[in-house]
Amino acid sequence: MSAVRVVLVEDNDTFRETLELLFGVREEIEVVASVATGDEAATVCSSLVPDVVLMDYRMPGLNGAEATRAVLTACPTTRVVCLSASVTQQEIDEVRAAGAVACVTKDEDFDSLVATVREAAAA
């Protein structure tokens, strides 16, 4: 089975770099790009066409719902998983309406996060 190709979208540099390191030791996940904004996500995804975008909800510029729409316009086959420290039900509803297939919190254990990414790719 080939690795799930993932783009990370997270404005917190430390958290984004930590995710890169953690995913880097997992053979089933390949981080193909890592960016800090939703605007960058849409641009990167249009050229890389990842399987999954793991995207923060609260970022400068486009929020998670707006960035999800932009990514899915550029790459309709890509699956988006929203990742946030805390999201309201309204934000979850917004990102789901925009096309995200899942929404998880940043305190989720890493194995569960990997499972969510794999499930999203298989959807």
Predicted segments with their positions:
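Alpha4 helix (beta4-alpha4-beta5 surface) of REC/receiver domains from two-component response regulators
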Residues: 87-104, 108, 115
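Two-component/phosphorelay signaling modules centered on CheY-like receiver
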Residues: 13-33
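Two-component signal transduction core modules
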Residues: 34, 53, 80, 103-104
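Short amphipathic alpha-helix used as the core "switch/output" element in two-component signaling
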Residues: 65-76
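Acidic catalytic/metal-coordinating carboxylates
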Residues: 37-40, 60-66
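Active-site residues of response regulator receiver
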Residues: 56, 84
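Conserved acidic carboxylate
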Residues: 10
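Active-site beta3 strand of CheY-like receiver
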Residues: 48-54
